[in-house]
């Protein structure tokens, strides 16, 4: 059986490295490969022009591999890593949505690791490296993965709210939503899906629990929010993690939940040498994440760094939302001019900075001790950085130099 891997990302590399003895050697196609060669394990590294669909039995893409790519168009036996590993997948919980996937997945694993739960998918470990004998897989599941998945399904699907994101990849918001909901049609009567009330009528055999907001979800599961130390925008993530625990174990471990430590790059606060507050929210790559960050600091004047790769999303609603705040904007990235245009139409004061270091320096000229400087860019980072993590690191380095 010949398996072709599309893209040389974390997912496909893990498959190639861990399963080469069982299924390899693999043919790995990537636009960055200009000539045919072998890696140290004997896998072939090929340019996409060399792909012959008649010589391939299975094609597995990296999750973010664009659906319009010629390899996807030619593939006859396309399947996601979820489908590929489904036959050995133990009981699983999939967590998706636009914002909060990572935090909810980490919190749920924190609550359930004592029963043998392991974390993977879009966060942590690729499926190729997960223990198939673990009691439970808790998988952060992206819309990209769901788009390519047609066989696999979880026992519990926890869907956080959906807002516009990755529209240039999916083609439209409706396509994005449909990919998020696609797994419901494969779930059965023994499965459980938790989803926003707006999608409550989506056909499925699974037991549905719909919620309007975090308060409603807490009521549905008998969760006392006063016992949770996390506040918005992380409160919903915490409630969802507890809901998953409640379904599986019929327990609510508040103390264990409250011992969870948040990861960096999400509303990560730091002070400069003048004791002024700066917030690294580099992971906020869409409008709903930025709105949540703004609401957290609504009682302060906000100096917001915004911009990057906007992924084809219309951010007009975000800028209209900003009218409710005492806010000044600092535009960066490839979308600098677009951000300035949004700001002008919304009658918001904005500075043209283009690069992150200039934005930090410009803010430093205006920022007072009782105000907040916020990197919550509403855009992806790949126009100027290798990742959102690098963007956050550079931001903190710039702040520490002040």
UniProtKB/Swiss-Prot annotation:
Any one GO molecular function term: UDP-N-acetylmuramoylalanine-D-glutamate ligase activity
Main location: cytoplasm
Catalytic activity annotation: UDP-N-acetyl-alpha-D-muramoyl-L-alanine + D-glutamate + ATP = UDP-N-acetyl-alpha-D-muramoyl-L-alanyl-D-glutamate + ADP + phosphate + H(+)
Domain of life: Bacteria
Metabolic or biological pathway, per its Swiss-Prot or TrEMBL entry: Cell wall biogenesis; peptidoglycan biosynthesis
Compartments where found: Cytoplasm
Membrane-crossing segments per the record: none
Binding site for ATP: 97-103
InterPro entries, per database record: Mur-like_cat_sf, Mur_ligase_C_dom_sf, Mur_ligase_cen, MurD
Signal peptide segment: none
GO CC aspect terms: cytoplasm
Listed EC numbers: 6.3.2.9
GO terms under biological process: cell division; cell wall organization; peptidoglycan biosynthetic process; regulation of cell shape
Record's keyword terms, sorted: ATP-binding, Cell cycle, Cell division, Cell shape, Cell wall biogenesis/degradation, Cytoplasm, Ligase, Nucleotide-binding, Peptidoglycan synthesis
General function of this protein: Cell wall formation. Catalyzes the addition of glutamate to the nucleotide precursor UDP-N-acetylmuramoyl-L-alanine (UMA).
Protein family membership: Belongs to the MurCDEF family.
Protein's name according to its UniProt entry: UDP-N-acetylmuramoylalanine--D-glutamate ligase
Gene: murD
